[in-house]
Structure formats: structure tokens, C-alpha cells
Amino acid sequence: MYKVIGATKSRAMRVMWMLEELGQPYEHVPCGPRSDAAKQYNPSGKIPALVDGDEVLTDSVAIMQYLADKHSALTAPAGTPARARQDALTFWLIDEMDAILWAAAKHSFVFPEEQRVPEIKDSLKAEFARSAVNLSDRL
């Protein structure tokens, strides 16, 4: 059985959602980033991590792709043009849109208050709007 390491209100939810979609049982070990529990699975303390037998995998997108490939579901076959297009869109979403959302989160609640720059949010909103148009054009 898989083991998912990470808080529910984190990117660990992506992994748990993927496992639910695949119909795969899993154990959830709730813990926050940089916690002692998280560091047992990833020395940096970043979450999520997935334990599959003796293997520990990290990074939510890599974990989801691993699971899709392992179970031959929810993805195009590796080495096909369809998979290359899927990967291109996935990586673009992570690089462009998720990065903007993460920057907004850091300046809203992740960083200590004295490190937050609230003024950045207007530029992030504008960049997200441009990326949304770009996404619409891609689809």
C-alpha cells in the first residue's frame, strides 16, 4: 500500500486525489513541511512524499506522473506525441500558473508578516490574467 506524507492542505492533496482517481488504497501521514516527520522521508522536509515499497518519491507532479505510468491510467503512453503534448501543458501550468499562485501564497500567509510584500499581489494578478489568456489560446 502506498503511503502519502504531507498535510491535507498542501500539494499532498494532489497525490491523494490521484490515488483516489486510480482506486488505489493508501495510508496518509499528515505532517507539515520541514517537520521532523517530513524529514524522515525527505531530508529537505518538503512535502509531499510518496512511499512505494522501499522507494521514496518527492514532488507532487513527478509522483502523479509516476502513478499514472505505473497504473497505465489517466495519461497518454510514454514516448507518444500525445504524451509530449500532455507533458508540455503540465510543465507550462506548473512553470507559469502555479508559480504565480505560490508567490501569492508566500506573500499572503507562508512568509512571516515582516517578509511579506503585499504590493506584489497586483502584479501577480496581472500576470495570472495574462497566463489565463495564454492557457485559453493553448487549449
Task: Indicate where each model-derived feature is located.
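Amphipathic alpha-helical packing segments from all-alpha helical-bundle domains
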Residues: 120-138
